[in-house]
Swiss-Prot record:
Predominant cellular place of this UniProt entry's protein: cytoplasm
Protein's name in the database: Citrate lyase alpha chain
Subcellular location: Cytoplasm
Enzyme Commission identifier(s): 4.1.3.6, 2.8.3.10
NCBIfam families in the cross-refs: citF (TIGR01584)
Lineage: Bacteria, Pseudomonadati, Pseudomonadota, Gammaproteobacteria, Enterobacterales
Length: 510
């Protein structure tokens, strides 16, 4: 009885304070410990299957679902999730994957059936890209850079309702990384952004490990639901396609020339930083820098971006002090992330977001990037092929080109009978004002806006030609290609890293 009186007096004291303070704070309501523990069961995040996870996530028609592309061409998560979503009858969804590849061809049918009606992505390849280029999707695809995606998410334009994140392993509370388990993909740099910003986060994992699983790239307080599946991705396919290490003699020639350009650019000095983009020649530049770094006793402070086996090798030899990894480009890089303390995982926000308080690209000295096309104004296309069909990705191209002290584009002058250097690119991803040097197998051109670079290279005995001279050389080799015919219909909108529209892609005329 005394206990009830004391409880009543305490409640009256609280109510009196609320009245005096003119506030509306809720009064404490006592409940049994068992009730709390039933509501907060230790295994409450675990779902028996993907259908249960989707149902519990609260997904509804018209919402936005997101995915990451750490597995690149080996991704199995997008198709698996979208197949179940389609069977459950959902319609009119926005699909926001950090990038899409050849392996995502099954999305074509989901678009035809009205399951997916809008897409945000960095890139498109294969049958999906071909069908969209021919007008499959009613609304234009929104193409963004890696940094630009984070900006769209944080600005509120791209609101992620449910993020489905495939990982090799996690514990029953959601702590996960990408380098523990069979499907070792390395950095989860793109997934971290989704985990930070999505209203609901569903973790798909191949393996459940004891709690607490650490280090955790994605942490327990970011994850709502967990479902164990057989496979989330084929890690063996990460280092294929655009991230392969080349043996092509022409690409190696271009890479060697680019390394010479870097050495004599004025930026090759103790403590410099570097990044190489996707594409055979750009990735190969790193291997040619090793001897030059040794002979001049130069070490890089960091390498950034997509990390490769070659960069790991230089790191372990002491030539690159730290690796800042937003995406691991091969199994060696993924495994290095687990064993090397100075191989550091970073999010796409830390990597390249224009609106970030501290994007690593803003500390970058040298970047080497590839191109499908480049024109005489140094504008670069990495999205559409010479036939006008979508077959590439914006990636971090425009993010790094503008932010780095020195941006180098490496590309063959011609590919077969198709010129790489043209009068005007079909699609502009990176504006020419961001590009400093073009290195081809027929010569090197420097942007006239950077005369000091041309002077340094010439003083070192490197021949520099005008981009107009290279364009004429390409014309002599290939002739004038037939112009591509397009319809008036826009199939893709290209967003610059700040969210502005830099170009549009029209439907190819059949």
């Amino acid at each position: 009885m005394t206990q009830k009186i004391e409880q009543s007096q305490r409640q009256e004291r609280v109510a009196a304070w609320n009245r005096r303070a003119e506030c509306d704070l809720a009064a404490f309501q006592n409940s049994p410990k068992q009730t709390y523990q039933a509501e907060k069961a230790r295994d409450r995040k675990l779902c028996a299957n993907l259908e249960e996870a989707i149902r519990r996530s609260g997904l509804q028609d018209g919402m936005t679902v997101s995915f990451h592309h750490a597995f690149r061409g080996g991704d199995l998560t997008v198709n698996m999730v979208m197949d179940v979503i389609a069977k459950m009858g959902f319609k009119n969804l926005t699909l926001a994957s950090s990038s899409l590849s050849d392996c995502h061809a099954p999305l074509v049918e989901h678009i035809r059936q009205g399951v997916v009606t809008r897409i945000y992505t960095s890139g498109l390849r294969g049958p999906l890209a071909e069908e969209i280029s021919r007008g499959l999707l009613a609304e234009p695809v929104q193409i963004h850079s890696h940094g630009g995606r984070v900006h769209l998410v944080q600005s509120g334009e791209l609101n992620i309702d449910v993020a489905f994140l495939g990982v090799p392993s996690c514990d029953e509370f959601g702590n996960a990384n990408g380098y523990t388990g069979k499907a070792c993909c390395g950095s989860l740099g793109y997934a971290i952004v989704d985990a930070d910003n999505a209203k609901q986060v569903v973790m798909l994992t191949e393996e459940l490990l004891p709690y607490p699983h650490n280090p955790a790239s994605i942490e327990q307080d970011q994850v709502d639901l967990i479902v164990k599946v057989d496979r989330v991705g084929d890690a063996a396919k990460i280092g294929a396609g655009a991230t392969r290490m080349t043996t092509n003699p022409r690409e190696l020639l271009i890479a060697r020339s680019a390394a010479d350009v870097i050495v004599n650019s004025g930026y090759f000095k103790e403590g410099f930083s570097m990044q190489t983009g996707t594409g055979g020649a750009s990735l190969a530049v790193t291997r040619f820098l090793e001897d030059k770094m040794r002979s001049r006793d130069i070490r890089a402070d960091f390498a950034l971006g997509g990390i490769t086996a070659t960069m790991v090798d230089l790191h372990e030899k002491g030539l690159i002090r730290k690796l800042l990894d937003v995406q691991s480009f091969d199994s060696h890089a993924a495994q290095s992330l687990a064993r090397n303390p100075n191989h550091i995982e970073i999010s796409a926000n830390q990597y390249a977001n224009w609106g970030s308080k501290g994007a690593s690209v803003d500390r970058l000295d040298v970047v080497v990037l590839s191109a499908l096309e480049i024109d005489t104004q140094f504008n670069v296309n990495v999205l559409t092929g010479s036939d006008g069909v979508l077959r590439g990705a914006s990636g971090g191209h425009c993010d790094t080109a503008i932010a780095s002290a020195l941006s180098i584009i490496v590309a063959p002058l011609v590919r077969g009978r198709i010129p790489t250097l043209v009068d005007n690119v079909l699609t502009c991803i990176t504006p020419g004002s961001s590009v400093d040097i073009l290195v081809t197998d027929h010569g090197i051109a420097v942007n006239p806006a950077r005369p000091e670079l041309a002077e340094r290279l010439q003083e070192a005995g490197i021949k520099v030609v005008s981009i107009e001279w290279l364009r004429e050389r390409a014309r002599l080799l290939t002739g004038e290609p037939q112009p591509i015919e397009f319809t008036d219909r826009v199939v893709a909108v290209v967003r610059y890293r700040d969210g502005s529209v830099i170009d549009v892609v029209h439907q190819v005329k059949e």
